[in-house]
């Protein structure tokens, strides 16, 4: 389909997704957190203030790799009061890989916070062995306040369905097959996001600049969503057209 040629593959642009300011508002920076964590888990210092603690079968090398990725993508920025920056926890075991972030009280209830940290997880997953991973938001007592799966399914031709939140690999695989059957996926390397959260199911298509202003393209995406919807669990589905920086340019609910 022509809209694939106009876009469809995103880059490593989570800061352009509007996450920079949001991250600063919700991460917990405290020397007390470091003291608590240091009594329980080994850690790797990134820069002079930020730290990755690791447990289970995760290694020091894993923690260093994750820390480097978080720094490269702007999450770790060597800032914070009292000489302490941000803390992140990496765990590996029989249940897979989990990355946990300490966040300010109540921040997990803010709009788009789930998407914000899922995108961070998507960016750094290759540094800890790849998909899938679990992303958790914790309070200062280490209680899990929010948890999301971040995974991907790659189809023939390098088209990718990312599945987020409560969405599963089998749902992403089924959606990918449906998108192929309905000629959306054509082996040109398109990216689609399937998200399931408390507010329902969202299907996001990465498109080229201006595609969201073209009525014919929009109608095409509406049709594809209705056709592929059963593979994602059925309608209604929130349809979103996003640019290659994952900024939502058009959204509607498809019934």
Show the residue positions of the predicted features.
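Short, non-transmembrane amphipathic alpha-helical segments
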Residues: 66-71, 75-78, 107-132, 175-180, ...
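Tandem-repeat/low-complexity and Cys-motif detector
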Residues: 55-58, 88-92, 109, 124-127, ...
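A short amphipathic beta-strand at an alpha->beta junction
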Residues: 48, 56, 121-148, 165, ...
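Hydrophobic membrane-insertion alpha-helices, especially the h-region
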Residues: 18-33
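Juxtamembrane low-complexity tails/linkers enriched in Ser/Thr-Pro and polybasic
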Residues: 1-10
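Short edge beta-strands and adjacent turn/loop segments
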Residues: 42-46, 75-103, 182-207
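Second-shell loop/turn segments in exported
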Residues: 51-58, 101-111, 160-167, 205-215
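N-terminal presequence-like segments and adjacent domain-start helices
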Residues: 32-66, 151-173
């Amino acid at each position: 389909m022509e809209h694939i040629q106009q876009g469809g593959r995103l880059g490593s642009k989570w800061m352009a997704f509007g996450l920079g300011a949001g991250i600063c508002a919700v991460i917990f920076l405290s020397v007390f957190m470091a003291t608590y964590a240091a009594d329980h888990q080994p850690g790797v210092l990134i820069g002079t203030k930020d730290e990755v603690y690791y447990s289970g079968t995760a290694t020091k090398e894993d923690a260093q790799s994750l820390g480097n990725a978080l720094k490269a993508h702007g999450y770790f920025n060597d800032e914070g009061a009292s000489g302490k920056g941000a803390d992140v926890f990496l765990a590996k075991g029989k249940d897979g890989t989990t990355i946990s972030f300490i966040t300010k009280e109540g921040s997990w209830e803010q709009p788009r916070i789930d998407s914000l940290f899922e995108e961070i997880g998507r960016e750094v997953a290759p540094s800890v062995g790849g998909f899938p991973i679990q992303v958790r938001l914790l309070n200062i007592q280490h209680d899990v306040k929010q948890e999301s799966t971040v995974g991907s399914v790659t189809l023939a031709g390098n088209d990718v369905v990312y599945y987020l939140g409560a969405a599963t690999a089998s749902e992403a695989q089924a959606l990918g097959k449906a998108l192929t059957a309905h000629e959306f996926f054509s082996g040109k390397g398109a990216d689609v996001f399937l998200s399931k959260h408390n507010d329902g199911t969202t299907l996001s298509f990465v498109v080229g600049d201006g595609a969201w202003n073209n009525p014919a393209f929009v109608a095409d995406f509406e049709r594809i969503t209705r056709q592929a919807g059963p593979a994602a669990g059925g309608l209604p589905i929130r349809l979103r057209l996003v640019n290659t920086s994952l900024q939502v340019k058009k959204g509607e609910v498809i019934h």
